[in-house]
C-alpha cells in the first residue's frame, strides 16, 4: 500500500508540475511567491512523512528487496542500501529548498515557481532512481536529473559582479556566455557523453538476460571478455559522474556557479548515484573482472587523492575548495566499495552519507551566507570574520572539523571503516590512501584560518558586517545537518544494522 501511495503522489505532483508550467501565466495571477514556496515545502514534508512510514515498515532481518510492488509495469522496492540513500534525499530536499528561501526578493513569480519545481522534480527523480528495480528505468532516471539541474544552474546560478557589487548584465549581442551557463553546459556534455558507454553496457545486460529486472542479473554467467566490455562501459559513466581524476574538471566549475540549492543537491545526493550504480550494476555479477581491474581502479583513486589534494592547496575560490574536497572523499568511497569486504563497503556508504551532510553544510556557509552577503568567492576577500561574525565562525570551524573526520562524527566512522576495508584488500593502497586525511586537514585549516583570522579585510566595510551574522533560517539548516552528523557518528548502528544483509550479498570469493 505504501509503495502505491508514494508512486501515486509522485505521479500526481509531476502532472501538476507540467500543468502549472504550461499555464503559469494564469495560475500566478493570484499566488504570492511565499505561498509558492510554502506549498512546495509542504509537499516535501509529506514525502518525509511517507519516508518515516517506510522506515517503520522496513525489516532489517530480511535479505533482498522489500515492499516490492509492480506499478505501471515497473517493479519498485527497497533494500537497506536504497533505504538510507532515500533518507538522505528526504533530509536534504527541504534544506536545499529553504537555502534559497530569499529568492523571491528580487525575482518574478515565474522564476520562483521554476525554482521550486526544479527542486521537486530533481528530488522525485532521485527517489524513483533509488526504488526502481529494472535496468531501463534505472538508466533513464540516472540521466534524467541532468535536464532540471542544467536549467537550475544555467538560469538560477550565480551572476558575475563588479567591484561595486553591481550585477554585470551581458548584452544581447555579446557572443560570450555567462560562467553559470558554461557550467551548465559542462555538466550536461560531460555526463551525457559518458552515459552513452553506460547505455551500451546496460543494453548488453538486457540482451543477455532477455529481461530488465535487477534480480535476473544474478542468474546469468558471463564470460570474462563480456564482463570486461560491460565493466568498462559502466565504469566510464560512473567515474565521470563521481567524478575522479582526470574527468573531474566539470565539478569545481559547476559548484562554483550553482545556486546554493544546486550545490547541496549535487554534492549531497546526485554524485551518490554513482556509488549506487556500482552496487546495482557492477558488484552483483562482474566479480571476476573486478579482480582484474581493481588495481587500475585503486591507482585512479590514489592519483585522484594526491593530484586533487595538491591542487586544492592552490585554489583561492572558496566554493571550488569545497568542490575539490568532495572529489577526494568520493575517491575514498570508490576505492573502499571495491574492497570486497563488509567493512569497506559499509565504510563507502557511510562516507557517502556523511559527505551528504558535511559538504552541504560547508556550501551553505561559504555559498549561502558569505557569497549571498558579499558576492565574492575569493578567499582573500575575507579576513578576520571571527571578530565580526562570531556565530558564523563557530559553525564554519565545526563544519571543517567534521569534513576532516573528527571522532564522534559520521565522517570519522566512514573513513575509519573505509581505510580498514582498503587495508584488508591491499595494505599499500591503504597507506597511500591515508594521505587524504593529511591533505584534507591542511586545506581545511587553510580555508578556516584565512577566512576567520588575520587583519581586517580592506575590501569589506566594517560597518556593513555588523548584524550580518548567521540568521535564524540558516541556523536551523546548519543545526539539522550537524545533528545528523553527530547522531550517526555516536550511534552508527542506526545505519549499519540496515546495511549488513544487503552488503553481505555483494561479496564474492576470489578465484
UniProtKB/Swiss-Prot annotation:
It is found in: Mitochondrion membrane. Its EC number is 7.1.1.2. It is a multi-pass membrane protein. The chain crosses the membrane at residues 1-21, 39-59, 78-98, 116-136, 137-157, 186-206, 220-240, 264-284, 289-309, 318-338, 349-369, 388-408, 422-442, 476-496. GO terms for biological process: ATP synthesis coupled electron transport; electron transport coupled proton transport. It catalyses: a ubiquinone + NADH + 5 H(+)(in) = a ubiquinol + NAD(+) + 4 H(+)(out). Core subunit of the mitochondrial membrane respiratory chain NADH dehydrogenase (Complex I) that is believed to belong to the minimal assembly required for catalysis. Complex I functions in the transfer of electrons from NADH to the respiratory chain. The immediate electron acceptor for the enzyme is believed to be ubiquinone. The keyword Lipid metabolism does not apply. It comes from the Eukaryota. GO terms for molecular function: NADH dehydrogenase (ubiquinone) activity; ubiquinone binding. The keyword Transmembrane applies. This is NADH-ubiquinone oxidoreductase chain 4. Keywords: Electron transport, Membrane, Mitochondrion, NAD, Respiratory chain, Translocase, Transmembrane, Transmembrane helix, Transport, Ubiquinone. Pfam families: Proton_antipo_M. GO terms for cellular component: mitochondrial membrane. Belongs to the complex I subunit 4 family.
Amino acid at each position: 500500500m505504501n509503495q502505491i501511495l508514494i508512486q501515486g503522489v509522485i505521479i500526481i505532483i509531476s502532472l501538476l508540475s507540467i500543468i502549472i508550467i504550461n499555464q503559469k501565466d494564469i495560475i500566478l495571477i493570484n499566488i504570492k511567491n511565499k505561498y509558492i514556496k510554502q506549498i512546495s515545502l509542504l509537499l516535501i514534508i509529506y514525502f518525509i512523512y511517507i519516508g518515516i512510514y517506510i522506515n517503520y515498515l522496513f525489516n532489517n532481518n530480511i535479505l533482498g528487496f522489500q515492499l516490492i510492488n509492480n506499478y505501471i509495469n515497473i517493479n519498485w522496492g527497497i533494500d537497506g542500501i536504497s533505504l538510507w540513500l532515500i533518507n538522505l534525499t528526504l533530509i536534504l530536499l527541504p534544506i536545499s529548498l529553504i537555502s534559497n528561501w530569499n529568492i523571491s526578493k528580487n525575482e518574478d513569480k515565474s522564476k520562483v515557481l521554476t525554482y521550486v519545481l526544479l527542486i521537486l522534480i530533481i528530488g522525485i527523480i532521485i527517489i524513483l532512481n533509488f526504488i526502481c528495480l529494472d535496468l531501463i528505468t534505472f538508466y533513464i532516471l540516472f540521466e534524467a536529473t541532468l535536464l532540471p539541474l542544467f536549467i537550475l544552474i544555467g538560469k538560477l546560478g550565480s551572476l558575475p559582479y563588479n567591484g561595486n557589487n553591481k550585477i554585470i548584465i551581458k548584452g544581447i549581442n555579446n557572443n560570450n556566455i555567462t560562467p553559470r551557463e558554461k557550467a551548465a553546459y559542462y555538466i550536461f556534455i560531460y555526463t551525457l557523453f559518458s552515459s552513452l558507454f553506460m547505455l551500451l553496457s546496460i543494453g548488453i545486460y538486457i540482451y543477455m538476460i532477455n529481461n530488465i529486472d535487477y534480480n535476473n542479473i544474478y542468474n546469468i554467467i558471463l564470460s570474462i571478455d563480456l564482463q570486461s566490455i560491460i565493466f568498462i562501459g559502466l565504469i566510464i559513466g560512473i567515474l565521470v559522474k563521481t567524478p575522479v581524476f582526470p574527468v573531474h574538471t566539470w565539478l569545481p566549475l559547476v559548484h562554483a556557479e550553482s545556486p546554493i540549492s544546486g550545490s547541496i543537491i549535487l554534492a549531497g545526493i546526485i554524485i551518490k548515484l554513482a556509488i549506487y550504480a556500482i552496487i546495482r550494476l557492477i558488484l552483483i555479477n562482474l566479480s571476476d573482472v573486478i579482480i582484474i581491474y581493481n588495481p587500475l581502479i585503486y591507482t585512479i583513486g590514489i592519483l585522484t587523492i594526491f593530484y586533487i589534494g595538491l591542487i586544492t592547496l592552490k585554489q583561492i575560490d572558496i566554493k571550488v575548495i569545497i568542490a575539490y574536497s568532495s572529489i577526494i572523499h568520493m575517491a575514498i568511497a570508490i576505492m573502499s566499495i571495491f574492497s570486497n569486504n563488509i567493512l569497506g563497503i559499509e565504510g563507502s556508504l557511510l562516507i557517502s552519507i556523511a559527505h551528504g551532510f558535511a559538504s552541504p553544510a560547508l556550501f551553505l556557509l561559504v555559498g549561502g551566507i558569505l557569497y549571498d552577503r558579499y558576492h565574492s568567492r575569493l578567499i582573500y576577500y575575507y579576513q578576520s570574520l571571527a571578530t565580526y561574525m562570531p556565530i558564523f565562525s563557530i559553525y564554519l570551524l565545526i563544519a571543517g572539523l567534521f569534513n576532516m573526520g573528527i571522532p564522534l562524527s559520521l565522517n570519522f566512522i566512514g573513513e575509519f571503516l573505509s581505510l580498514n576495508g582498503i587495508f584488508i584488500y591491499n595494505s599499500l593502497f591503504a597507506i597511500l590512501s591515508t594521505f587524504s586525511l593529511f591533505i584534507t586537514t591542511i586545506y581545511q585549516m587553510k580555508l578556516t584560518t584565512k577566512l576567520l583570522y588575520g587583519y581586517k579585510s580592506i575590501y569589506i566595510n566594517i560597518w556593513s558586517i555588523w548584524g550580518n551574522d548567521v540568521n535564524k533560517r540558516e541556523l536551523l539548516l546548519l543545526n539539522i545537518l550537524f545533528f545528523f552528523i553527530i547522531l550517526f557518528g555516536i550511534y552508527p548502528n542506526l545505519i549499519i544494522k540496515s546495511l549488513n544483509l544487503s552488503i553481505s550479498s555483494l561479496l564474492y570469493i576470489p578465484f
